[in-house]
């Protein structure tokens, strides 16, 4: 038996769980900075559960599909600029330029507004900072969790400042309702699915 846990910096340990005398396996896949690096953790889980050959085969398929899509994006003659996420409270958490999502934008050959950022995680910024840098982005990608799909009226009602974005005005906002779509469950192990979607959005030709 073992307990699989995601480690967090400065967490001070695992409290009472450490006293159960059951081995703890730290699964740090979410800390990877490339989509394929994160997906490759399926090989570790394959070893753990005795299905290594199947896991290796699946990762090889994911890797092959991802590389093929990446090459296709490089052949595109057009590329949209992109900004992502929504304001949460007083901060807008944008993916760092070296984060998994930031590098996915790069592999999709999109012009990410914060591509020059050096963080590997999310970066909390003021709304004004995001608007100044990404207000003219061609495409805006948002994730949310709601009972029903968001509309432009919902975005405006949530925060009037959203209406100033070019992508809002041109109706070029793409949303993923994580209450209906298994985004967080699927994309860590099938980043090629997400890359394919990004390429279709950022290279409409």
Identify the role of each PLM range:
Residues 20-21, 108-109, 169:
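Short, structured coil segments at secondary-structure junctions
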Residues 64-65, 69-151:
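Flexible, glycine-rich surface segments
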Residues 114-116, 120-205:
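C-terminal soluble interaction/assembly domains
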Residues 11-14, 39, 94-102, 159:
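Short, surface-exposed alpha-helical segments at coil->helix boundaries
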Residues 1-2, 137:
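Local beta-strand N-terminus motif with an aromatic residue
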Residues 2-4, 10-90, 115, 180-205:
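Extracytoplasmic substrate-binding proteins
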Residues 1, 15-19, 151-154, 161:
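Alpha-helical segments with a strong preference for the paired helices of cellulosomal dockerin domains
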């Amino acid at each position: 038996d073992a307990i699989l846990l995601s480690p967090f910096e400065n967490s001070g340990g695992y409290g009472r769980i450490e006293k159960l005398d059951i081995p703890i396996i730290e699964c740090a896949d979410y800390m990877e900075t490339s989509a394929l690096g994160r997906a490759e953790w399926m090989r570790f889980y394959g070893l753990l559960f005795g299905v290594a050959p199947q896991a290796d085969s699946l990762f090889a398929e994911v890797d092959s599909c991802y590389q093929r899509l990446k090459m296709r994006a490089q052949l595109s003659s057009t590329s949209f600029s992109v900004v992502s996420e929504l304001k949460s409270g007083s901060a807008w958490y944008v993916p760092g330029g070296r984060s998994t999502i930031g590098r996915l934008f790069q592999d999709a050959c999109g012009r990410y507004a914060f591509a020059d950022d050096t963080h590997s995680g999310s970066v909390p910024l003021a709304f004004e900072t995001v608007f100044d840098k990404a207000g003219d982005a061609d495409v805006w990608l948002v994730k949310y969790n709601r009972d029903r799909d968001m509309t432009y009226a919902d975005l405006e009602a949530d925060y009037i400042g959203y209406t100033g974005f070019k992508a809002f005005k041109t109706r070029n906002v793409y949303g993923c309702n994580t209450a209906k779509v298994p985004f967080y469950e699927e994309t860590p192990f099938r980043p090629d699915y997400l890359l394919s979607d990004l390429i279709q959005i950022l290279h409409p030709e």
